[in-house]
């Protein structure tokens, strides 16, 4: 079991995107915003288990404590978290063969201490 906390206000990847034009092809491309890239970089300081590259079935439970009561898409938050776990090599990949479930994941409110609590357990 691996459990750790990222003491930063959670940021979604999809709600913070930029559209740019590829200089070579002239086609529009969607890239993460500077805000998301900064969040991803700062998360690296708090992610535990870097380099584990877990490749067996696991349950990834994420509890997001948001700074406001605004509605937020849990799926987008989890997608951003899974991408960060793959980037920092905690998980080998974020496909369904490795992340079997996200049971228990939810969004709560904590104005004073926004954070993300992540628990990774072996899947049964």
State where each predicted segment sits:
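Acidic, proline/glycine-enriched N-terminal capping motif
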Residues: 1-124
